[in-house]
């Protein structure tokens, strides 16, 4: 983890570059424009910036007033350092904010806690005795309070940083689909929700040994199996709730995959009274040849 402080009385212009570590920054006494991952941010007052790893950043800023220089505080951290703090924070946070928007929020007005902790780092670092372990502990403590303050301002930091540090991509996608199963999901939608590009996301899924279309079908089928077993919804209602294009299509794919109709599955599932029935059926399922209903 590394803290830096910059003081400037001149214009600060940076052409687009990629940062190699996640970063929290606070900019005071400045005005101008900052661009993070294509999102343009007009700076007119003090601002806190939340920048995930590998983000593309550029800026063109000047002092807000002639007599006062602009100040920039930055705290950068590795994936391991950020994850260690998240493990402490997760018990105090919800797993993720509802999907009201797929656009990341990279900036907020600095909460008082953020100002206080950056001020503390500026005053204390470097420590006079140059103890690396004590400096690391101080920065970790400040990062904890800074991230918590940002989260309390409504920024879903777990989701914002998730693409780089959290669960495997197939699990992240499963979480998105189960939140909105009726949405007609495409790879572009999921990539946008995870703040990445379709090509990068596809590479991650390839490394995890699964395609987007297969994952989408598996998630929807898994939900359908649970509805058939534990609810009294009709087959038509279940096909709609799980996001299939039509009841006929759902029944056709279900039969090809499990060698029985949804109604037959429901009957057998309830007659068997076996808690492992769904698991065993899934292990015996057939691969599906995709058609235009399930589209990337």
Swiss-Prot record:
DNA-binding region: 188-209, 235-258
Gene Ontology molecular function terms on file: DNA-binding transcription factor activity; transcription cis-regulatory region binding
Keywords: Activator, DNA-binding, Plasmid, Transcription, Transcription regulation
Ranges for domain HTH araC/xylS-type: 171-268
Classification via Pfam families: HTH_18 (PF12833)
GO cellular component terms attached to this protein's record: cytosol
Record keyword Transferase present: no
SMART domains given in the database record: HTH_ARAC
Family annotation (PROSITE patterns): HTH_ARAC_FAMILY_1, HTH_ARAC_FAMILY_2
Functional description taken from the UniProt entry: Positive regulator of the expression of the urease operon.
Protein name: Urease operon transcriptional activator
